[in-house]
């Protein structure tokens, strides 16, 4: 059974792009949820879902935030460590 990866990203975020490119280079598909500082531009999620994410993960202040099978692993560096 393959793992489900979710990447919470922000526009013009170099670390977010690095994480997504890293996943692609490993042949891993992922779901992206893009959070904008102003009005949330969310792919496949509602504003309430994004608000719930922020409330449940108050220490997740940087982007990207990466989840594997629903569990937050952290950002790009943690993703790279996990997959190497």
Segments (PLM) and residue ranges:
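Local sequence-structure signature of Cys/Sec-based thiol-disulfide redox active-site neighborhoods
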Residues: 1-33
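Thioredoxin-like thiol-disulfide oxidoreductase module
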Residues: 35-60
